[in-house]
Amino acid sequence: MSNIRELQDIVIQVRRDILRMVHKVNSGHPGGSLGCAEFFVSLFYDVMEIKMPFEMNGINQDIFFLSNGHISPVFYSVLSRKGYFPIKELETFRLINSRLQGHPTTHEGLPGIRVASGSLGQGLSVSIGSSISKKLNKDSKTVYVLLGDGELQEGQNWEAIMFAAANNIDNLIATVDVNGKQIDGTTDEVLNLGNLKMKFISFGWEVLVLEKGNNISEVIKSLNKAKSKLGKSKPVVILMKTEMGNGVDFMMNTHAWHGIAPNDEQLKNGLKQNPETIGDY
């Protein structure tokens, strides 16, 4: 395991990146991005086996798909700080002709992006296809995908969940960001998802529940435990409980910050709560 203090410093810096990116263009999705900072840092800095520079085909390395593409700020921040592209490019988030669009696309050729993810509900299907490709090519590495809990209200996911288990896709780790919030309210209010653990089990998946998805040590442990479950004829899912807006007190645990930007005073407040650690872009 990497040095947890160093990883936590990166998480804090990523939070700063998210706030500054969204504030500059007065547009974006800070809540879910902040809630998944620990996950992205854990995955890219500690868990995944990746090659640099970026290779689109992902042969003989772990690969990652972001399905809930609206949380692109956290994805872009971690990719840039991991060295996929220059950190200064974060300044272009959501600008015309930028490679860093509000929802990731492949058209711009941004390193780290393997599939467009503007429309919810498609990432799991794509990741299953990639997992099958690795099996056919005798590639032993792992495919990771992140989904939102509200995104599971899209029916395509359940076809994919059924297919993955029926076809023994056991080189796949899906993580669901369970923050209980979406654009119009709580997931219980909008379209209750029921007992996700029992649903995945009934579909034939290996299920892990991560109670502390904003604790970087626990995230790493859970991802490594998921890896230990691979190769046993079942796909693996982590139900990762997070807090929307984590790390910024006035954004925490409310759907109101799903898709709005902080104003000047709110930005100042949020940055004060997350002091610069490894350098602003």
Regions found by a protein language model. Name each.
Residues 82, 190, 252-256:
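Short secondary-structure boundary/capping segments
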Residues 216, 220-281:
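Glycine/aspartate-rich loop-and-adjacent alpha/beta segment that forms the canonical ThDP
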Residues 11-27, 177-179:
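N-terminal capping segment at the start of a domain
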Residues 110-112, 116-119, 124-230:
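Thiamine diphosphate
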Residues 70-71, 179-180, 241-245:
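Glycine-rich beta-alpha junction loops
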Residues 18-21, 33-166:
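Cofactor-binding active-site loop characterized by glycine-rich and histidine/acidic residues
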Residues 26-34:
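Structural motif
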Residues 1-6:
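Non-catalytic, mobile gating and regulatory segments of ester bond hydrolases
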